[in-house]
Structure formats: structure tokens, C-alpha cells
């Protein structure tokens, strides 16, 4: 995951964030106040497109701490196909819960 996080951060023009992977009950990922990223260990069961989307989403939060239009424009710039990954996460995410 670290090479993916580093490459997305470089494309976003931000410093590569610290990465932690742990079991989270309610979230797939989050961006910490100190610009670190925490990803849910359950993502390891998800397709690569979904993992990439979550990394892109959280890296975008380093620059945009909201879900306004500018945030989504950055997500789309970094991953034009993000809507498909988001759909997969919403429809199929239950399958990756153990």
C-alpha cells in the first residue's frame, strides 16, 4: 500500500502521508488531523480499484478537509473512474466485512 499512497500523494502535490492499517468498525478510511491516513484492514479483501479510490479519497482530504465541489474535482482529477469504485464500495462493501 505504501507505494500506492506515495504515488497518489505525488500526483496530488502533497507530502506522502504516514500510513496505518487497522480494523475500524465504521469507516473504510480517514485522514488524521496531522495528515496521516488510516485504512481499514478489511480493504485488503476489496478489488484494487476500490483500494485505489480510498487512497485517493483520503489523500485528497490532505488538501481539502471537506466534501465540497473542490474536493470531488481533485478526486476526479486523480482518479477519473472513481465513481465506479465508489459504486462498488457502496454495493459490494458488505462482502469484505469479516
Q: Residues of each region from the PLM?
A:
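Active-site-proximal or metal-binding-adjacent scaffold patches in catalytic folds
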Residues: 1-53, 62-98
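Walker B catalytic acidic pair
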Residues: 58
Amino acid at each position: 500500500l505504501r507505494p500506492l499512497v506515495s504515488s497518489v500523494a505525488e500526483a496530488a502535490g502533497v507530502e506522502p502521508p504516514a500510513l496505518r492499517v487497522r480494523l475500524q468498525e465504521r469507516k473504510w478510511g480517514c485522514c488524521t488531523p496531522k495528515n496521516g491516513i488510516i485504512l481499514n484492514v478489511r480493504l485488503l479483501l476489496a478489488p484494487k480499484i476500490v483500494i485505489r479510490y480510498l487512497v485517493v479519497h483520503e489523500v485528497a482530504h490532505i488538501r481539502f478537509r471537506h466534501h465540497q465541489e473542490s474536493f470531488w474535482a481533485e478526486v476526479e482529477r486523480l482518479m477519473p473512474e472513481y465513481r465506479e469504485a465508489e459504486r462498488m464500495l457502496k454495493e459490494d462493501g458488505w462482502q469484505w466485512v469479516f
